[in-house]
A protein has these predicted regions:
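Donor nucleotide-sugar binding/catalytic pocket of nucleotide-sugar-dependent glycosyltransferases
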Residues: 137, 156-230
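A conserved mid-protein helix/loop that constitutes part of the nucleotide-sugar donor-binding site
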Residues: 18, 238, 245-261, 365
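N-terminal subdomain of nucleotide-sugar transferases
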Residues: 1-50, 99, 124-127, 257-260
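Conserved acidic donor-binding segment of nucleotide-sugar-dependent glycosyltransferases
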Residues: 352-353, 357-364, 371-378
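A conserved catalytic-core segment of Leloir-type glycosyltransferases
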Residues: 30-32, 36-99, 103
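Acidic donor-binding loop of glycosyltransferase active sites
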Residues: 309-323, 336
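A short, well-ordered alpha-helix in the C-terminal region of glycosyltransferases
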Residues: 366, 379-394, 400-406
Length: 416
């Protein structure tokens, strides 16, 4: 099968891109041809198909909204890429004409490519399968968060809540544009052109089906790990570990609050420590002279793996509806118990008392209780083994591939 893989970044910047390259490798290893469509960036992985890529909004060095210089041209591009871009539609149709794919597998496109990629593919008679990593189809700011708490007002009261609260980037303009784009996409039924929606979690699947999306078109196919490293014998480490993005919704503040009261315990926090949230937390730790919390910064490769191996357990303290984070599966790979917030998809990963513990989101006292339950090496070893078994039974590459190919084959067969 020849598959056109669409994502607005062609370099690793987070979980969706890790998945993109992992699935690309997996499909190619199974004999499929995978061809990318994306946006030009100086960070992109080299590919002969970059000649089809579209220009970014703010230059090839800009990645995030805040880095884009606001000019009349860039503002116009922001609008079209949020609502509908004829430029992008033309580009993907040109690539489809040349490479003649059997199917489009769409990952991330919102605000950078626009749903014109869906229309472009359908106008060329190519079926589209869309994988969802967040809640952009339901929430204007993608994460159901407002002021450090879960908010679903847009589902119950309508999108005026988003505009009133300036939910998107704290900006009235950005909030209005996002709400308008969502209403416009609904008006033109652009997502009717998607043959199937792939969700990593049952939680996201249920959210979609409860809010107007056809249940028979939604398929829960959990992601997988694809590390080539030999894990070796499990280790019972000496410290707790958080690794991942250090942003408000990830709940790292709860970890800091807990370990401030657990002076005999140690925690390491690994991830980009230049974010606004990381800087704030590091300042707090310094001001309060907390010695048992260590920020490691961003790590990768063998260094990252060694730090995970050396952990006693890992922490996923999210305060948002986290959607099957890769950090959980990476923890399972190294036979680590996981202490996670009881929110979103996390109970699908952590069975309380079996391969870790669940605690009340943002509740440092409850987290402290769960940390102390892992003082016993026997419990740590038993739960770590359960994590590994859970990974192999539910989140293996083989399981993911089989389920995904079933959807792909049906999409191509039933394409009209």
């Amino acid at each position: 099968m020849r598959i056109l893989l669409v994502n607005y970044r062609y370099f690793i910047s987070g979980g969706p891109e890790k998945y993109m390259f992992n699935i690309k490798t997996m499909l190619e290893n199974q004999g499929h041809e995978v061809i990318p469509f994306s946006i030009h960036s100086n960070k992109n992985v080299a590919t002969e198909y970059s000649k089809y890529f579209v220009e970014p909004i703010g230059g090839r060095d800009a990645i995030y909204f805040e880095e884009v210089k606001k000019t009349p041209r860039s503002i116009w591009q922001m609008l079209t890429r949020s609502i509908y871009s004829k430029e992008v539609e033309k580009a993907i149709k040109r690539e489809i004409d040349d490479v003649k794919p059997d199917l489009v597998y769409l990952i991330h496109f919102v605000n950078k490519l626009s749903p014109s990629v869906i229309r472009g593919a359908r106008k060329k008679g190519i079926p589209v399968v869309l994988r969802l990593s967040d809640y952009f189809l339901l929430c204007p700011r993608f994460d159901f968060m407002y002021e450090k708490r879960v908010c679903e007002e847009c589902l119950t009261k309508g999108y005026r809540s988003c505009i009133k609260k300036r939910c998107v980037k704290g900006s009235l303009f950005a909030s209005v544009v996002r709400v308008f784009s969502m209403k416009f996409h609904k008006l033109i039924h652009v997502y009717d052109g998607v043959y199937a929606f792939i969700t990593p979690s049952e939680f996201l699947k249920q959210k979609l089906s409860a809010n107007g999306f056809e249940e028979e078109k939604i398929h829960c196919i959990p992601t997988f790990t694809a590390s080539k490293t030999k894990v070796g014998e499990p280790q019972i480490g000496s410290y707790g570990l958080y690794f991942g993005r250090i942003t408000e919704e990830k709940g790292v503040e709860t970890v800091v609050q807990a370990y401030e009261k657990l002076q005999k315990y140690t925690v390491k926090i690994m991830g980009d420590d230049t974010t606004e949230e990381a800087i704030r937390l590091k300042r707090y730790i310094k001001e309060h002279k907390i010695k048992n919390i260590e920020f490691l910064g961003f790590k990768s490769g063998e260094e990252l793996e060694d730090i995970i191996k050396g952990a006693r357990f890992t922490l996923i303290p999210s305060i948002w509806y986290d959607n099957l984070p890769n950090t959980a599966l990476e923890s399972f790979q190294y036979s680590k118990p996981v202490i996670a917030s009881n929110i979103g998809s996390l109970p699908e990963l952590v069975v309380d008392g079996e391969n870790g513990y669940l605690f009340k989101p943002a509740d440092a006292e409850d987290l402290i209780k769960k940390i102390k339950l892992l003082d016993d090496d026997t419990v740590v070893e038993k739960m770590g083994a359960a994590s590994r078994r859970r990974l192999e039974s539910r989140f293996s590459p083989e399981t993911h591939y089989e389920a995904l190919m079933k959807v792909f084959s049906e999409a191509v067969k039933n394409n009209k």
